[in-house]
């Protein structure tokens, strides 16, 4: 039985480009896939997102543990429902992207706000751990 770390497919969904990556153990394990954002309709948006994730999946040839991606709000992130997005005129609210991707890829899908995920990543792997080290060395009880 393999005890390798799980592979997560990721997407940073912007109004201009969709940037897809595959991650394992905190690092990118394949070439990044960048596709022009298809924002005119839910169908074209879905097709582009599936194409990007399929391209990654075929390039790594290993089982996928989950899909996680950043999408601008508003959205019901817990349930994976995308709302009305200014940069995505073809998405008119109640776009069940989580369900669509889980059905297609047969793995869990997690969607969150792009700003929240940036802050979370910065807290774990960015400058924040270094700040905490400096505070601890200075004898400060503060920790962020």
Residue ranges with predicted function:
Residues 2-47, 51, 58, 82-84:
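Short glycine-rich, Thr/Ser-proximal phosphate-binding strand/loop in the N-terminal lobe
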Residues 8-12, 64-68, 110, 136-137, ...:
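Short glycine-aspartate micro-motif
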Residues 16, 72-75:
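Short glycine-rich anion-binding loops that position phosphate/pyrophosphate groups of nucleotides
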Residues 49-67, 108-109:
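Phosphate/pyrophosphate-binding loops at sites that engage ATP/ADP/AMP, CoA/4′-phosphopantetheine
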